[in-house]
Amino acid sequence: MDYKILWTDMHSNIHHEQMNELPQWFDQVQKMMDFWPIAYYPYTMRKDETGLGVEDRYPLDVIEKDWEALREFTEKVNAAGFPMFMGYEWQGAGQDGDHNVFCKDNRQKMEYPLRYADLVKAYAGKDVIGIPHHLAYQLENRGKNWATHNETFSPFVEIYSSHGSSENDNGPIEMTRHVHMGPRTGETCVERGWEDGYKFGVIASGDNHSAPCVYGFGYMACLAEDNTKEAIWDAMQKRHTYGVSKDRIEIRMQVDG
């Protein structure tokens, strides 16, 4: 099969206060990429009783209004022929790692379970995937918990982003951008998942919170039969993906013909 190599930034986090910038974000993506999974970020910083800043979800009515606005925009873009997927970031209780949840259609609702296993159950039987990112941070501090991993729900992982490389805990590309979440650990890194016997692909993507498609923060390549949502979703399910940190290097590989 002669697959098309399609490019995107699969980790564009848009916040509540940025929703009015969505058309501008899309304009940039449309000029640079072939498809776009966007991840709504339902979290904000608040002060606790001691004055310490903590991250918490926006009020539910705010989130649901934004989700419907994102749905409307995605359907408009899809109708115009551009393959866009809507999604959101899920963090739960911080014990299983952060995952971006994406749906094939535009009809799913956001779920807020505290644990990854319950997130998987919430979308059982539906065309939904959850992609872990910045995996190598500490366990229970938003690093990946391989003990709870589901390779069907999470067919690939984000090995590189603006946070750095989660491949292992001693590679040359460190994770020092957010030191409060570090350091990297061998217990949660990507190599540990392979050592545990899981089968999953890898991507790179930005983890951008101000604009999509930032050079140097990572891009995802998807090898698909065509540039449609159906073909792209099928390719992602089959783990036909890879990632680059900077330039869009084209790679074609086969196993067993």
Outline where the language-model segments fall:
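Extended, charged catalytic domains and RNA/DNA-binding interfaces, predominantly
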Residues: 1-257
